[in-house]
């Protein structure tokens, strides 16, 4: 950060032949998703940066992927402003940390892709900036291998996920329908849920307003540059770990009661609508969890269990700008969510597909006016010992218009420990998963590109 004004010096410790020795270091570290590089104040006189911007979790994992080697972790240094191939970092991590970072199956990035990375990620323009710049073709960096594209012959038109009327939560037919859909499909839509239509429309309009701001206004909230850690603008999924980027930008809001204290620092064009939507959706979240947990023989959600289920909600405003050739790229690649449950509000564009039960096909989830799409996350699949299913889903890009969606990820507290519920195992059933700290699961998910349900192997016995 000091551009070499301050020195991080090698040090070592010798063993002791006469007595035991202890020491207690305190490492003052950045957040895992913090982006670090030379400070703007250091470079304001025109001084050239010696280091590129790096996500701390990538730097951390590279450091722990090898033996102590002096100051080797700090290499390479750069003497110009060109950001070198981030895929090189991904390649190194793949070779040295195969157990942690997924293998890189794509070719190295070409020089033009490096320029795209610089513009989209490092200059904080996002894919929205590319579209605003007038690109007419999809850059190579966004083009999927042929075998990863969603071909028409893979779309199943004879099946659909259920649409459930929840106007009477106490109706046994409603509760049975929810639990059945959670077990068979992992996805369902709910209507008559109680969130006012005007609240749903307002938060979608707010998403369009934010992404309609000039780039210099949007970039004020870029992850690592935002005035608060509770709001972060990002692009794709994890660009530093991806060799093909996703055609999406998103603005994330951490919405726990403590996080809401930083509300005045959130973007004025959308903060009121985000909070109103979260407040309106909370009763729905609680009813859904109550029904789903009762289906697992949990009669009461006490304070400790509530922390494990829903302590850290996250609201995402996802933005998919119009794409010149949507068949070549992905809005979001196939993945399952690392939430307990997720609530998705679609606009009228469509484009969400879920994995069919035959595992080789995909089912479109058509927008239903006023509906919320509900899907099970990995956490609930693990807690249910596979009774409920966290299903892969993906989003295709749109060639005719900009698309927005609004998600609420209902997440555990960072230090919550989760595993199969005792109520599920009380009859002697064997657990399929070990107990895991949520922050560890979260970090593993964000250490790699979207890879279907591979994250669940982190917890599987």
Language model region names:
Residues 1-461:
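Peripheral, non-catalytic segments flanking oxidoreductase cores
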């Amino acid at each position: 950060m000091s551009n070499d004004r301050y020195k991080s010096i090698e040090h070592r410790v010798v063993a002791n032949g006469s007595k035991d020795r202890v020491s207690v270091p305190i490492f003052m570290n950045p957040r895992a998703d913090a982006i670090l590089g030379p400070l703007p104040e250091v470079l304001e006189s025109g001084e050239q940066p010696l280091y590129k911007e790096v996500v701390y979790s990538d730097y951390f994992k590279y450091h722990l992927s090898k033996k102590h080697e002096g100051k080797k972790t700090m290499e390479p240094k750069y003497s110009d402003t060109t950001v070198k191939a981030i895929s090189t970092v991904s390649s190194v991590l793949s070779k040295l940390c195969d157990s942690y970072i997924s293998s890189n199956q794509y070719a190295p990035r070409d020089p033009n892709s490096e320029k795209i990375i610089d513009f989209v990620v490092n200059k904080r323009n996002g894919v929205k900036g590319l579209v605003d710049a007038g690109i007419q073709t999809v850059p190579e960096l966004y083009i999927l291998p042929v075998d990863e594209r969603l071909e028409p012959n893979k779309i199943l038109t004879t099946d659909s996920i259920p649409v459930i009327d929840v106007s009477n939560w106490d109706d046994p037919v409603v509760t049975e329908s929810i639990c059945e859909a959670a077990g068979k499909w992992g996805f369902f839509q709910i209507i008559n849920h109680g969130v006012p239509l005007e609240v749903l429309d307002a938060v979608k309009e707010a998403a369009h307003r934010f992404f309609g701001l000039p780039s210099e206004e949007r970039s004020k909230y870029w992850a690592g540059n935002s005035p608060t850690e509770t709001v972060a603008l990002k692009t794709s999924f994890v660009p530093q770990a991806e060799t093909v980027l996703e055609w999406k930008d998103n603005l994330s809001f951490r919405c726990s009661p403590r996080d809401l204290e930083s509300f005045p620092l959130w973007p004025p064009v959308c903060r009121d609508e985000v909070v109103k939507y979260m407040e309106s959706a909370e009763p729905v979240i609680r009813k859904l969890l109550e029904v789903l947990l009762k289906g697992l023989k949990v009669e009461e959600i006490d304070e400790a269990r509530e922390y494990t289920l829903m302590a850290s909600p996250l609201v995402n405003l996802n933005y998919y700008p119009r794409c010149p050739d949507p068949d070549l790229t992905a809005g979001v690649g196939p993945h399952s969510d690392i939430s307990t449950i997720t609530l998705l509000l679609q606009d009228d564009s469509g484009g969400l597909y879920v994995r069919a039960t035959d595992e080789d096909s995909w089912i479109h989830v058509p927008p239903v006016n006023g509906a919320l799409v509900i899907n099970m996350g990995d956490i609930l699949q693990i807690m249910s010992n596979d009774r409920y299913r966290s299903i892969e889903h993906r989003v295709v890009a749109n060639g005719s218009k900009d698309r927005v969606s609004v998600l609420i990820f209902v997440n555990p507290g960072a230090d919550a420990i989760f595993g199969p519920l005792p109520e599920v195992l009380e009859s002697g059933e064997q657990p399929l998963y070990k107990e895991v700290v949520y922050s560890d699961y979260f970090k593993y998910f964000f250490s790699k590109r979207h890879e279907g349900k591979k994250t669940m192997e982190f917890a599987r016995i």
